[in-house]
UniProtKB/Swiss-Prot annotation:
Catalyzes the conversion of monodehydroascorbate to ascorbate, oxidizing NADH in the process. This is Monodehydroascorbate reductase II. Optimum pH is 8.0-9.0. It is an enzyme of class 1 (oxidoreductase). Belongs to the FAD-dependent oxidoreductase family. Disulfide bonds: none annotated.
Length: 10
């Protein structure tokens, strides 16, 4: 779930 990390980082 690397996508979530990028989403949070924006």
């Amino acid at each position: 779930a690397k996508t979530f990390k990028y989403i949070i980082l924006g």
